[in-house]
């Protein structure tokens, strides 16, 4: 069930993007919206199991990097914090998909639009469910790419071009700090798994931990559009209205909140 709620938005987005001409506009609407709505229903069931019944779930998909120096795995953990955000994201995304069917009805590029929406949702779920910093980083960067594509959906409009570029560049400032913090974590801990890092943190140098914490906070400020890195958020409304609702709601901006919360309280 948890693998389905994770993978359905990706499958829907890929079907709409790669097979859009064959399945048509209506087919794209049905596939992407159904996939996200089913994932949302599964997330509600998962929320009951994980949060209310206190039964966290971990899924190991395979190793990404395996060496004597560092091991990075493709692992997903559905705990109280991640399921709370995933459920919110999928419910809001399913509503945005439904609204977009009518709103984008006159646009000739529906398949591309719904593909972007679904892939954005998928990478947001990947970010929140990742069991280590590198899986989180993959989701983090790809939601930036998807948000750029969505804001710049009407790419023939100069205002949309400028807004998308501004969003992309401002987020890169925060992402640079995030990248440095992840490299520092690898150098200090020799591991990127949340559980290992959190358990070893009390034994590490406080100055190094403070520096890493500040870098992580600065990285989160970019996604959450906090003071100094908030200039991209108002201009993001240059994209279609459903894009603005998805980015301005508890989806993209919640990524920075999640990054902060996982370090305030160890996932359980």
Where are the language model's segments positioned?
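...captures the hydrophobic TM-helix bundle architecture rather than a specific catalytic motif
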Residues: 1-265
């Amino acid at each position: 069930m948890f693998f389905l709620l994770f993978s359905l938005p990706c499958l829907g987005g890929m079907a709409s993007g790669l097979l859009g001409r064959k399945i048509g506009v209506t087919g794209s609407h049905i596939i992407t919206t159904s996939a996200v709505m089913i994932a949302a229903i599964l997330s509600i069931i998962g929320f009951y199991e994980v949060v209310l019944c206190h039964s966290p779930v971990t899924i190991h998909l395979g190793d990404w990097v395996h060496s004597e120096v560092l091991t990075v795995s493709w692992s997903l953990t559905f705990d109280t914090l991640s399921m709370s955000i995933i459920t919110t994201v999928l419910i809001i995304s399913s509503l945005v998909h439904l609204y977009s069917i009518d709103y984008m009805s006159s646009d000739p590029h529906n398949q591309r639009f719904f593909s972007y929406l679904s892939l954005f949702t998928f990478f947001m779920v990947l970010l929140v469910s990742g069991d280590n910093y590198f899986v989180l980083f993959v989701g983090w960067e790809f939601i930036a790419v998807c948000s750029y594509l969505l804001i710049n959906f009407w790419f023939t409009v100069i205002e949309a071009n400028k807004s998308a570029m501004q969003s992309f560049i401002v987020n890169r400032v925060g992402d640079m700090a995030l990248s440095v913090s992840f490299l520092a974590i690898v150098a200090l801990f020799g591991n990127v798994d949340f559980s290992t890092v959190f358990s070893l943190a009390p034994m590490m140098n406080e100055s190094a931990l403070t520096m890493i914490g500040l870098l992580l906070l600065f990285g989160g400020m970019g996604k959450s559009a906090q003071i100094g890195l908030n200039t991209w958020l108002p201009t993001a409304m240059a994209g279609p209205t459903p894009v603005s609702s998805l980015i301005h709601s508890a989806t993209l901006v919640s990524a920075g909140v999640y990054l902060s919360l996982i370090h305030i309280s160890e996932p359980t």
